[in-house]
Amino acid sequence: MPNNTLQHTEAPTYRVVTYGCQMNVHDSERIAGLLEEAGYVPDPRTDTLAPADVVVFNTCAVRENADNRLYGTLGHMAAVKSAHPGMQLAVGGCMAQKDKDTVVARAPWVDVVFGTHNVGSLPVLLKRARHNATAQVEIEESLVTFPSNLPARRDSAYSAWVSISVGCNNTCTFCIVPQLRGKETDRRPGEILSEIRALVNEGVQEITLLGQNVNSYGVQFGDRGAFAKLLRACGNIDGLERVRFTSPHPAAFTDDVIEAMAETPNVMPSLHMPLQSGSDEVLRRMRRSYRSTKFLGILDRVREAIPHAAITTDIIVGFPGETDKDFAETMRIVEESRFSAAFTFQYSIRPNTPAGVMKDQVPKPVVQERYEQLVELVDDIAWQENKAQVGRAVEVMFAQGEGRKDEATHRVTGRARDNRLVHVSLNPGDDVPRPGDIGEVVITSGHPHHLVADGGLVNLRRTRGGDAWHARQGQVSQGTPTVLGLPTVGVPRH
């Protein structure tokens, strides 16, 4: 049962643990902002199981393993909470929306359950749970407040997420997201651009536009060309160095977006284009509304307009009814597409989806074998593509937390314009770049998941983003969120 006794009079602490996609990471920044506005301070520890006065789990429901890991973690948290009277646990996000009636039944020590549509209610629900000494479960079926209208505590001083829409109008048979995020709701362009300008004024120099399907942005207010126009408008914002977006949908990806990418200098030459399957029959069963020929045509047009574009993708192995022939088609399309990285997943049955009740579910051993073959091919192609970068001069924006072995290898790490991960060795006398600073390097070796520049910096530019990072030092950090379900862009999933 929830415990409503606080044991100290200091400012209460919080930690947010994030599972899933970039949208969840952005939502977690909103959760952190709400809690700080309510008087909480971030707990400096990054260990998920370390005690804090409030621990919030922002969950994912795309795959079954995310469910299992969350409930496993909640099981461990029962003992932690028992040893720390007054501690509160909250579960939000997509899994909370899906399992609203069962979270507290499976984990009765949880204090608050909130969904994807009412993130802003969390502080009130925590207060109510403490006062009433009983769990508070509040799930809304439609959006209460657009997330970007809530306060935020951004994880990065120099890079930011910007939501352009929430929800999805597609009906992919394997996907549970539209049930949990609702129908698409678009923000007006002026509101989005005002937020971006405000972020740039704070030192942000890279933004990622977020939507479940960015290509359909604008349909709600009657402008099918709105996304391309938005990209071009971002090009007119002084101080905005890099613009990225995720995720598009092949069925709605149009040439005006390709032209906007090619003609807007601060829109980066990287594209994440989900394939899901190379088999037309499987795509039909998935209800993906495109076929492999259309997909390959998109890649051809992107590469014609943006020759050095790095293209990544998502692929599902073992969708119901997938035959050896279907899988061979996927392998053929992957070979032809030459992805710089691919996020490969084994099909996971999701409740209340058409695919979940389809006949001909593929046996697990077959799925595993195909998965391993696909990962091997994806890594081989990525390695070839990365080795082709050797000798190129690339611009790198250095980042905090990207190079997990930087201290041991004496390197610094960042992202190239095409979003490839680059590890850089500094020469004696080189200035040490701060996160957010931008340097030019020459690639000396390519590896399946990253590039290396062992020749030091060609030049280094101190940036407003680096200044913003420096100004943050000494503040309590929320640390790097725990992200499960979707890997960092550029790193194939194993």
From Swiss-Prot:
Gene Ontology cellular component annotations, sorted alphabetically: cytosol
- Enzyme class, spelled out: transferase
Cofactor-binding details, from the entry: Binds 2 [4Fe-4S] clusters. One cluster is coordinated with 3 cysteines and an exchangeable S-adenosyl-L-methionine.
Q: What is its main location?
A: cytoplasm
Q: Which residues bind [4Fe-4S] cluster 1?
A: C21, C60, C94
The UniProt keyword set, sorted, is: 4Fe-4S, Cytoplasm, Iron, Iron-sulfur, Metal-binding, S-adenosyl-L-methionine, Transferase, tRNA processing
Q: In which compartments does the protein localize? A: Cytoplasm
Instruction: Name the reaction it catalyses.
Output: N(6)-dimethylallyladenosine(37) in tRNA + (sulfur carrier)-SH + AH2 + 2 S-adenosyl-L-methionine = 2-methylsulfanyl-N(6)-dimethylallyladenosine(37) in tRNA + (sulfur carrier)-H + 5'-deoxyadenosine + L-methionine + A + S-adenosyl-L-homocysteine + 2 H(+)
Family matches, as SMART domains: Elp3 (SM00729)
Where is the Radical SAM core domain positioned along the sequence? 154-385
MTTase N-terminal domain location, by residue?
Answer: 12-131
Cofactor list: [4Fe-4S] cluster
A Pfam family matched in the record: Radical_SAM
UniProt-listed Enzyme Commission number(s):
2.8.4.3
What interactions and quaternary structure are annotated? Monomer.
Q: Which family does it belong to?
A: Belongs to the methylthiotransferase family. MiaB subfamily.
Describe the task this protein carries out: Catalyzes the methylthiolation of N6-(dimethylallyl)adenosine (i(6)A), leading to the formation of 2-methylthio-N6-(dimethylallyl)adenosine (ms(2)i(6)A) at position 37 in tRNAs that read codons beginning with uridine.
Matching HAMAP family, A to Z?
Answer: tRNA_metthiotr_MiaB
Q: Which NCBIfam families match?
A: miaB-methiolase, MiaB/RimO family radical SAM methylthiotransferase
What's this protein's name?
tRNA-2-methylthio-N(6)-dimethylallyladenosine synthase
Q: Name the source organism.
A: Cutibacterium acnes (strain DSM 16379 / KPA171202) (Propionibacterium acnes)
The gene designation is: miaB
